């Protein structure tokens, strides 16, 4: 949780740069900034131009108020930050980076201050509009990778603490794929537009008490299914034949550009879920086995 501070969010920002909200005209420079940082920091994944264009399309988190871009005297983007928050959510999420050549000058600290103040403002706005579950305590959640010690030092110095770890697991596809059969009455089908809404509802149900998860509305789900890297041909849904109810789903993506830099190609399972009433029937195992077969057939090295 973050305490109260009575200031405009932009007052937190470092005056070495000129600050403005991100817009369509900034897409190339914004993407180039993130790519420069990624070349040095080597994250597992980073946002590219198409991802940033999707961010600008959000109506739940309008870019004019929820993004900030810092440019130098030549107009080159050197730092950015953004937050997202669901209207009835109990937290905001913060994202950002500083050009490696401009780090160590207090710019990241200023961005963090901006994120915190925007989080306070978003919670206050939700409370003013009568959202019952917004909660009185503003909370900002940040993510970092283990090798990014400079980020850890910044966050810890500002009073943040580690609350959750995530692991990314890989499996070679050349060593054979396990067999996993669905029981009678269940059917595996392709994931297409006709199932988008049913899978959204199934996902919200499956993750309703999962740590840190919040329901996804139509806009948020649209960003999932229309993600620039989304691969519906590598995804699948399990249906209960008698009712047509979604019994499980596996939504996958493929980062062809990232594969070139990593030296191997992979199919990535972004979301895997089984609603409660269908658990314990081997559905997740069958979906993962199907995903590996799809990835292998597409010529990928790993899952």
Regions picked out by a protein language model, each given a short descriptive name:
Residues 1-11, 84-184:
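Acyl-donor-binding surface of acyltransferase catalytic domains
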Residues 71-73, 171, 239-241:
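Active-site beta-strand termini and strand-to-loop segments that position acidic
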Residues 104-121, 270-274, 280-297, 302:
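Conserved acetyl-CoA-binding loop-helix of GNAT-fold acetyltransferases
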Residues 207-257, 272-274:
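Phosphate-binding active sites in nucleotide-utilizing proteins
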Residues 25, 34-123, 131-133, 144, ...:
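Conserved donor-binding loop and adjoining core beta-sheet/short helix segment
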Residues 1-29, 273:
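A generic N-terminal leader/anchor concept
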Residues 57, 67-68, 80, 122, ...:
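Ligand-binding pocket scaffold of soluble enzyme catalytic domains
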Residues 18-30, 187-201:
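A short beta-loop-alpha structural element at the N-terminal edge
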């Amino acid at each position: 949780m973050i305490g109260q501070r009575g200031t405009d969010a932009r007052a937190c920002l470092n005056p070495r740069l000129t600050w403005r909200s991100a817009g369509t005209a900034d897409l190339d420079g914004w993407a180039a900034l993130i790519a420069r940082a990624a070349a040095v920091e080597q994250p597992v994944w980073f946002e590219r131009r198409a991802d940033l264009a999707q961010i600008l399309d959000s109506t739940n988190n309008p870019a004019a108020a929820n993004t900030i871009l810092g440019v130098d005297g030549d107009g080159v983007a050197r730092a950015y930050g953004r937050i997202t928050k669901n209207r009835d959510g109990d937290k905001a999420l913060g994202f950002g980076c500083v050009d490696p050549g401009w780090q160590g000058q207090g710019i990241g600290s200023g961005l963090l201050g901006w994120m915190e103040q925007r989080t306070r403002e978003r919670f206050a706005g939700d409370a003013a509009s009568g959202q019952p579950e917004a909660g009185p305590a503003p909370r900002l959640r940040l993510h970092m990778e283990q090798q990014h010690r400079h980020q850890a030092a910044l966050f810890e110095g500002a009073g943040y603490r580690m609350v959750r770890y995530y692991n990314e697991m890989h499996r070679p596809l050349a060593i054979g794929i396990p067999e996993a059969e669905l029981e009678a009455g269940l059917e595996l089908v392709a994931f297409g537009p006709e199932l988008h809404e049913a899978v959204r509802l199934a996902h919200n149900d499956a993750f309703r008490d999962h740590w840190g998860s919040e329901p996804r509305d139509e806009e948020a789900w649209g960003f999932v299914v229309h993600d620039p890297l989304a691969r519906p041909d590598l995804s699948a849904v399990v249906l209960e034949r008698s009712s047509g109810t979604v019994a499980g789903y596996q939504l996958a993506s493929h980062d062809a550009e990232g594969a070139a830099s990593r030296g191997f190609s992979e199919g990535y399972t972004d979301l895997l879920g089984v609603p409660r009433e269908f658990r314990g029937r081997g559905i997740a195992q069958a979906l993962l086995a199907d995903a590996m077969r799809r990835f292998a057939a597409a010529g990928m090295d790993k899952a």
